[in-house]
Swiss-Prot record:
GO terms for biological process: translation. NCBIfam families: PRK00831.1, rpmJ_bact. HAMAP family: Ribosomal_bL36. It comes from Beijerinckia indica subsp. indica (strain ATCC 9039 / DSM 1715 / NCIMB 8712). Keywords: Ribonucleoprotein, Ribosomal protein. InterPro entries: Ribosomal_bL36, Ribosomal_bL36_sp, Ribosomal_L36_bact. The keyword Phosphoprotein does not apply. PANTHER family: 50S RIBOSOMAL PROTEIN L36 2, LARGE RIBOSOMAL SUBUNIT PROTEIN BL36B. The gene is rpmJ. GO terms for cellular component: ribonucleoprotein complex; ribosome. This is Large ribosomal subunit protein bL36. One of its GO terms (molecular function) is structural constituent of ribosome. The lineage of its organism: Bacteria, Pseudomonadati, Pseudomonadota, Alphaproteobacteria, Hyphomicrobiales. Disulfide bonds: none annotated. Belongs to the bacterial ribosomal protein bL36 family.
Length: 41
């Protein structure tokens, strides 16, 4: 999992990317392309 400052640019790179909030943190998850998994930090 990558830690990025801004997830908006990452989200637009693949159409299956989902933005989720868990425990006060923002995550990008992608079921089909696992390499797009990231957390905002």
């Amino acid at each position: 999992m990558k830690v990025r400052n801004s997830l908006k640019s990452l989200r637009t790179r693949h159409r299956d990317n989902r933005l989720v909030r868990r425990k006060g943190r923002v995550y990008i998850i992608n079921k089909t392309q696992k390499r797009y998994k990231a957390r905002q930090g």
